């Protein structure tokens, strides 16, 4: 998923503090709106609980208060990726080859921006997804949002 310049800067700023607490920074989303939201996804081999989210929120808030990279009012949310885990990097897609995913593209491919299929392969910055029996290839930079589809 192509990150905005702000999201790239924020990722660089908060990766070290998150990792220092023993967590993986899965990714971030900055959603602009009347009340903007900075959403941070963390994970660990042991899973994530509410106290973990609070610890990361406290640490990240301190970094953001000093650096002050966001010029508008916003809410900070820290959570686990959940069952419908968002995918941000080529490594995330590679980790979940064989899993079903929904994609929202920045620019339409074949007149479609929304796609759902099974991740087949990752080649550099290109993601192959099998959609209705046909392989479709998407540039990571054209993927606005991607989430795993949970099955119960």
From Swiss-Prot:
UniProt cross-references to CDD domains, sorted A to Z: YlxS_C
InterPro entries: Ribosome_maturation_RimP, RimP_C, RimP_C_sf, RimP_N, RimP_N_sf
Protein's GO biological process: ribosomal small subunit assembly; translation
Entry keyword Metal-binding: no
The organism's place on the tree of life at top rank: Bacteria
One annotated Gene Ontology cellular component of this protein: cytosol
Keywords: Cytoplasm, Ribosome biogenesis
Gene3D superfamilies: Ribosome maturation factor RimP, C-terminal domain, RimP-like superfamily, N-terminal
Subcellular location: Cytoplasm
Cited NCBIfam families: PRK00092.1-1
Role played: Required for maturation of 30S ribosomal subunits.
Family: Belongs to the RimP family.
Name of this chain's protein: Ribosome maturation factor RimP
Gene source species: Escherichia coli O1:K1 / APEC
């Amino acid at each position: 998923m192509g990150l905005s310049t702000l999201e790239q800067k924020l990722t660089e700023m908060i990766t070290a503090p998150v990792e220092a607490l023993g967590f993986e920074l899965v990714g971030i989303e900055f959603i602009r709106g009347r009340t903007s939201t900075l959403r941070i996804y963390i994970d660990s081999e042991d899973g994530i609980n509410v106290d973990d989210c609070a610890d990361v929120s406290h640490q990240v808030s301190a970094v953001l208060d000093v650096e002050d990279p966001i010029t508008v009012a916003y809410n900070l949310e820290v959570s686990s990726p959940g069952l419908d885990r968002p995918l941000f990097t080529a490594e995330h897609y590679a980790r979940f080859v064989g899993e079903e995913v929904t994609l929202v593209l920045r620019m339409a491919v074949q007149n479609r921006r929304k796609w759902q299929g099974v991740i087949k392969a990752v080649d550099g910055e290109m993601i192959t997804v099998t959609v209705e029996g046909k392989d479709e290839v998407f540039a990571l930079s054209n993927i606005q949002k991607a989430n795993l589809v949970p099955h119960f």
